[in-house]
Amino acid sequence: CSLCFHSAKVEVQGKALTEHDMRPYKGSRMISPEEIIDKTSGYPTASLMFYREMVDALPDFYNHAPIADIPLQLLAANRGWAWYMDEPMCVYRLGGAASWTTLMKQGNYEKKQQDYAAAMTEMYRGFDAFSGGRFHNTVEHAIKRLIFLTQVNTKHFDTVLNKENREFYRELNARTRFFIRFETSAPKLYAW
């Protein structure tokens, strides 16, 4: 086992609406390296447990990443499977004034999202080289998901609703899909 992690309770600060739990999977189970690399939802960073030796010498793809948690997960995936515990044992705070998400929404949000997607794409490709291409197809699929989610975040719904993105669209929760459909079919009512 290269990584253990668990679910989290979500504590919302401010006016954000979200799920009350952060549960990447339903039920405790083994997670394959491919699932770690190309996951449909995030892992609570505070829950990540791994061997210290994994971070003794960090590769370039880690050092140049805009965030640290996903590259850590990729390092773990390169070492093997993970164990997920479907038990909330930490709190994931959402909407704090100094949080990464809040800071991303200040200023030119679209440019920040595009820059983030470009940096993460470079990071994934760096991991692909680091792992000797063992997970190449999985990495490329993860990049497609990342680009899709960037389009969701920046409200490029024509791309989001494109037939080629149907797989990723179906992974969105029902609330998000409802609001995308509402905003695209009744934009004046949505803006009201």
Model segments located where?
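Phosphate/oxyanion-binding loops and surfaces in catalytic or ligand/nucleic-acid-binding neighborhoods
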Residues: 11, 79-83, 130
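Short, conserved alpha-helical segments within structured domains
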Residues: 68-69, 139-142, 185
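Membrane-interface aromatic/basic loop that binds lipid-linked glycans or pyrophosphate carriers
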Residues: 147-192
